[in-house]
């Protein structure tokens, strides 16, 4: 039993939420610069799971995002197991295909995206790891003396 219900899977629900978010609306609401930046962070964060899913399937995420946005409001998306290229992708009814996500999982993903955006906006500085330069490994040594026949 899934207590909170289900939504279209394949990260289409998150992409649909992102697609419905309009910077114009928040600007009209006279939001502060920080609020607009936070809004854009959340919007981008909501697109990322779909992008990763498509990239992991070896497909072009840029093309499929545009196609998915056109059909996501109708509960349609793509079964990545059945498409071989973004050009040939045909939208399917996600619920009929059995591609679903529990609402709780989607809700928590949205809450986490908002939490990260809030943390970034309220932090004076962010600390990250500096990528280490890896020195080339030593080449293999020569054969010791007396080993030639």
Model-derived features: where do they sit?
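Extended, low-charge hydrophobic alpha-helical regions
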Residues: 1-149
């Amino acid at each position: 039993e899934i207590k909170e219900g289900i939504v279209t899977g394949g990260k289409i629900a998150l992409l649909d939420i992102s697609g419905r978010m309009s910077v114009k609306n928040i600007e009209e609401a006279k939001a502060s610069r920080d609020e607009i930046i936070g809004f854009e962070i959340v919007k981008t964060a909501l697109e990322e799971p779909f992008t990763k899913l498509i990239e992991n399937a070896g497909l072009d995420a840029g093309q499929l995002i545009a196609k998915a946005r056109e059909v996501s409001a109708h509960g349609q998306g793509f079964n990545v197991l059945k498409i071989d290229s973004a050009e040939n992708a045909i939208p399917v009814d996600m619920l009929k295909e059995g591609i679903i996500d529990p609402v709780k999982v989607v809700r928590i993903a949205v809450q986490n995206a908002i939490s990260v955006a809030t943390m970034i906006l309220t932090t004076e500085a962010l600390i990250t790891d500096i990528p280490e330069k890896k020195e080339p490994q030593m080449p293999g040594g020569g054969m010791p003396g007396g080993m030639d026949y």
